[in-house]
Amino acid sequence: MKTYRIGQIVPSSNTTMETEIPAMLQARYAEFPEERFTFHSSRMRMMHVNPEELKAMDIASDRCAVELSDARMSVMAYACLVAIMAQGDGYHRVSQARLQNTVKENGVEIPVLSSAGALVDTLKEFGYKKVSIITPYMKPLTKRVADYIEAEGIEVQDSISLEVSDNLEVGLLNPENLLEHVKRLNHDGVDAVILSACVQMPSLPAIQRAQDQIGKPVLSAAVWTVYQMLKNLGLETRVPNAGHILSGVKPQA
């Protein structure tokens, strides 16, 4: 039996990734009984999703990376999309390189991911060139997310903004409601649907059902982060009831 330490750098008011990522990885135990995972987090202060707090939070990510590397993680992920996307197109590359170097300077060689980078990498790996998205954000921030994705050469056909500004309230949204929201989303002709383009908006209970409902791959921030974590750990990318990309299928791109 081998134990993998999963590290997350999270906004202080977030709880969802620390719920959904353990749920997915522990759901693997029946199929992969030789695996065990432990879960560890370091927090960046953030209560409201605004430019000032996002910038301060991004700076704090360096401290968090050092703290997690002290405990010798197997892999770590910067689990916030908008903190990175708000800094400008392609910023996940800058952030990941900086955090990777910070960890290396602490004497640790481990993969350092970000949820923003994992989104871009996963869409490209699977050849998804057109998507539609659901976010909890106010419309200007949803546009920033869509623009970031489009700057990577992936078209965002449609988006729904739930317009919940309080980050704690986002974490309390009912994932079952996403099954109704997705009916309002224009997903004709898209390659995939992003059911939750936010690490704090719960979606895991709805992922597989939404995919079955619309007949297209359905992803979320937690799902694509787990996919990239498993890849970087050299493990099979399979999680039950977590959608197409975690079904063990190999990318076509």
Swiss-Prot record:
<dbReference type="InterPro" id="IPR028615">
    <property type="entry name" value="Maleate_isomerase"/>
</dbReference>
<feature type="active site" description="Proton donor">
    <location>
        <position position="198"/>
    </location>
</feature>
<keyword id="KW-0413">Isomerase</keyword>
<dbReference type="InterPro" id="IPR053714">
    <property type="entry name" value="Iso_Racemase_Enz_sf"/>
</dbReference>
<dbReference type="GO" id="GO:0051289">
    <property type="term" value="P:protein homotetramerization"/>
</dbReference>
<feature type="binding site">
    <location>
        <position position="167"/>
    </location>
    <ligand>
        <name>substrate</name>
    </ligand>
</feature>
<comment type="function">
    <text>Catalyzes cis-trans isomerization of the C2-C3 double bond in maleate to yield fumarate.</text>
</comment>
<dbReference type="InterPro" id="IPR026286">
    <property type="entry name" value="MaiA/AMDase"/>
</dbReference>
<feature type="active site" description="Nucleophile">
    <location>
        <position position="80"/>
    </location>
</feature>
<dbReference type="GO" id="GO:0050076">
    <property type="term" value="F:maleate isomerase activity"/>
</dbReference>
<protein>
    <recommendedName>
        <fullName>Maleate isomerase</fullName>
        <ecNumber>5.2.1.1</ecNumber>
    </recommendedName>
</protein>
<feature type="binding site">
    <location>
        <begin position="80"/>
        <end position="82"/>
    </location>
    <ligand>
        <name>substrate</name>
    </ligand>
</feature>
<dbReference type="Pfam" id="PF17645">
    <property type="entry name" value="Amdase"/>
</dbReference>
<feature type="binding site">
    <location>
        <position position="137"/>
    </location>
    <ligand>
        <name>substrate</name>
    </ligand>
</feature>
<comment type="similarity">
    <text>Belongs to the maleate isomerase family.</text>
</comment>
<feature type="binding site">
    <location>
        <position position="14"/>
    </location>
    <ligand>
        <name>substrate</name>
    </ligand>
</feature>
<comment type="subunit">
    <text>Homodimer.</text>
</comment>
<feature type="binding site">
    <location>
        <begin position="199"/>
        <end position="200"/>
    </location>
    <ligand>
        <name>substrate</name>
    </ligand>
</feature>
<feature type="modified residue" description="S-(2-succinyl)cysteine">
    <location>
        <position position="80"/>
    </location>
</feature>
